[in-house]
Amino acid sequence: MSDEEHHFESKADAGASKTYPQQAGTIRKNGYIVIKGRPCKVVEVSTSKTGKHGHAKCHFVAIDIFNAKKLEDIVPSSHNCDVPHVNRTDYQLIDISEDGFVSLLTENGNTKDDLRLPTDDTLLNQVKGGFEEGKDLVLSVMSAMGEEQICAVKDIGTKT
């Protein structure tokens, strides 16, 4: 066999699941749930009693963590729901490009250049304003199910 037969395409994704199962009856307010394929934060849970024909049901009201849309779902409490793996990571802001992308410094010293400026006006103004004033900013990035978005900004002082 030649060396060429052993080459394979490496993927950025290690094959880990983007969600994990959790019984509907154990999901609480402020937890996370996948509704209609979107990662959401639960804002309200109500449980109906077991009826004559079936299981107790959980009624979830949740907000999409990326686009803030309200979604609802009703699931039997004994069934499993998908729960997204949600990570929040802080990065230091290095630069803002003219095309609306940010350049961020990761913990290991590399740069991350694939994130757009936030669409939320308040957050956008905080990031742009602070950067123009020469402040050292740390941006919190929320990631779930293959999506990433800037969700918060912290001022850690002025640049020296």
From Swiss-Prot:
GO biological process terms, semicolon-separated: positive regulation of translational elongation; positive regulation of translational termination; translational elongation
Basic and acidic residues: bias regions: 1-12
An example Gene Ontology molecular-function term: translation elongation factor activity
PROSITE patterns to which the protein is assigned, alphabetical: IF5A_HYPUSINE
InterPro entries tied to this protein: IF5A-like (IPR001884), IF5A-like_N (IPR048670), NA-bd_OB-fold (IPR012340), Rib_uL2_dom2 (IPR014722), Trans_elong_IF5A_hypusine_site (IPR019769), Transl_elong_IF5A_C (IPR020189), Translation_prot_SH3-like_sf (IPR008991)
UniProt keyword terms in alphabetical order: Hypusine, Initiation factor, Protein biosynthesis
Renumbered residue ranges of the record's region Disordered: 1-21
PTM info: Lys-52 undergoes hypusination, a unique post-translational modification that consists in the addition of a butylamino group from spermidine to lysine side chain, leading to the formation of the unusual amino acid hypusine. eIF-5As are the only known proteins to undergo this modification, which is essential for their function.
Chain positions with Hypusine modification: K52
Residue stretches in coiled coil: none
SUPFAM superfamilies: Nucleic acid-binding proteins, Translation proteins SH3-like domain
Pfam families: eIF-5a, IF5A-like_N
CDD domains linked to this entry: S1_eIF5A (cd04468)
Cited function: Translation factor that promotes translation elongation and termination, particularly upon ribosome stalling at specific amino acid sequence contexts. Binds between the exit (E) and peptidyl (P) site of the ribosome and promotes rescue of stalled ribosome: specifically required for efficient translation of polyproline-containing peptides as well as other motifs that stall the ribosome. Acts as a ribosome quality control (RQC) cofactor by joining the RQC complex to facilitate peptidyl transfer during CAT tailing step.
Family statement: Belongs to the eIF-5A family.
PANTHER family, per database record: TRANSLATION INITIATION FACTOR 5A FAMILY MEMBER (PTHR11673)
Protein name: Eukaryotic translation initiation factor 5A-4
